């Protein structure tokens, strides 16, 4: 009799373009486990700096390894020319994340090609991308909108993280490096928030089939992560997650929700119920809510809540207007070294300091600035730490 096999979901994360490759590097630095990393770029020099498991240099004949020049058509053609290589790299994956910074050339044009290949191979395909800062120019913003639409049609689920929201979370002294690093942090959290649900065993477990049930063919999705300590910590963490200023829209009306609550061994049934009830109230009355808990004593008295909301109607999630940085009352981005962005943006909040729950988050949309930044390196995607 053959010994039992240990079947695990095969998850691959593909970073394409300058922003996508930077995002992958950040995930590797933060120790994201249980996934295989693939970096794809037309910029051969930038690709050399990647720490990914696999690197693919595309468009060598058309770009000579010098990048796409912020032209999505060049990026699309480069990815299509390498279709066979990309297909070989993605074969066997159960789930594929495609991450990129929208608005440039390689990521904007190539991400839909990668997503289409992954979906054709039968993998659950999730896009996690950033919308550019307004100061990056109107041309880049328009290219990003077109790229986001193309990617939405090519993958099962798409999470869009608007960089302009980071300005509302920062102070006037925030550096350019800090701003882009914090964007990478958000991308990291988008990928880690989903993979952790699958790869981390829980007391109430969420497996790959649960995730696939919510995200397969779901279209636009929203992701929020919150953490808190002290009295009412689980409820406050849930409030932070569903009202995150980094969400592009309100989760109201979501038909499918993935909810994970992580905490120490003292995590109580009553506080779990409070957090789950709050999320349930924010979603559609008939929503399919997949719930899981993880006991992790290394969290101490911190409770961490991850919410992925998907399955909106044809109109999609309701967008909200951008709030000016001066009007936003949120936690500041560290203005010193970029490494401090993680702690300032995603540090657990003392429960007593969290504002009362409100309906939905405000969204940030790409901007209308006049200037143009044509360098692919600028589309640095956001990542998050656990």
Swiss-Prot record:
Record-level Gene Ontology MF annotations: GTP binding; GTPase activity
Record localization: Cytoplasm
CDD domains given in the database record: FtsZ_type1
Gene Ontology terms: biological process: division septum assembly; FtsZ-dependent cytokinesis; protein polymerization
Family classification: Belongs to the FtsZ family.
UniProt name for this protein: Cell division protein FtsZ
Protein species of origin: Mycobacterium kansasii
Assembly notes: Homodimer. Polymerizes to form a dynamic ring structure in a strictly GTP-dependent manner. Interacts directly with several other division proteins.
């Amino acid at each position: 009799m053959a010994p039992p096999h240990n079947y695990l979901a095969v998850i691959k994360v593909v970073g394409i373009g300058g922003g996508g490759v930077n995002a992958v590097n950040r995930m590797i630095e933060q120790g994201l486990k249980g996934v295989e990393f693939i970096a794809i770029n037309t910029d051969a020099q930038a690709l050399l700096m990647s720490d990914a498991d696999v690197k693919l240099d595309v468009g060598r004949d058309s770009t000579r390894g010098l990048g796409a020049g912020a032209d999505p058509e060049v990026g699309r053609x480069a990815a299509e020319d390498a279709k066979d290589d990309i297909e070989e790299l993605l074969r066997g994956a159960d789930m594929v994340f495609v991450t990129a910074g929208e608005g440039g050339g390689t990521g904007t044009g190539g991400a839909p090609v990668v997503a289409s290949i992954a979906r054709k191979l039968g993998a659950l395909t999730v896009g996690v991308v950033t919308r550019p800062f307004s100061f990056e120019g109107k041309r880049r913003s328009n290219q990003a909108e077109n790229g986001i639409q193309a990617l939405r049609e090519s993958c099962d689920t798409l999470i869009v993280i608007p960089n302009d929201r980071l300005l509302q979370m920062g102070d006037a002294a925030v550096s350019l490096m800090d701003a882009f690093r914090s964007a990478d942090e958000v991308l990291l959290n988008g990928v880690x928030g989903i993979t952790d649900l699958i790869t981390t065993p829980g007391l109430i477990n969420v497996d790959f089939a649960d995730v696939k049930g919510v995200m397969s063919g779901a279209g636009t999705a929203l992701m929020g992560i919150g953490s808190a300590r002290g009295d009412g910590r689980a409820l406050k963490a849930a409030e932070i997650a569903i009202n995150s200023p980094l969400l592009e829209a309100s989760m109201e009306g979501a038909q499918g929700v993935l909810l994970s609550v992580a905490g120490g061994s003292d995590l109580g049934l009553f506080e779990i119920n409070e957090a789950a009830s709050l999320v349930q109230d924010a979603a559609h009355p008939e929503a399919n809510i997949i719930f899981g808990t993880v006991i992790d004593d290394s969290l101490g008295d911190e409770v961490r809540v991850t919410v992925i909301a998907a399955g909106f109607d044809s109109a999609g999630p309701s967008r909200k207007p951008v709030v000016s940085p001066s009007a936003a009352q949120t936690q500041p981005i560290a203005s010193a070294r970029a490494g401090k962005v993680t702690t300032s943006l995603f540090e657990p909040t003392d429960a007593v300091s969290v504002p009362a729950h409100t309906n939905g988050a405000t969204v940030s949309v790409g901007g209308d600035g006049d200037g143009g930044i044509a360098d692919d390196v600028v589309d640095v995607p956001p990542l998050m730490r656990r």
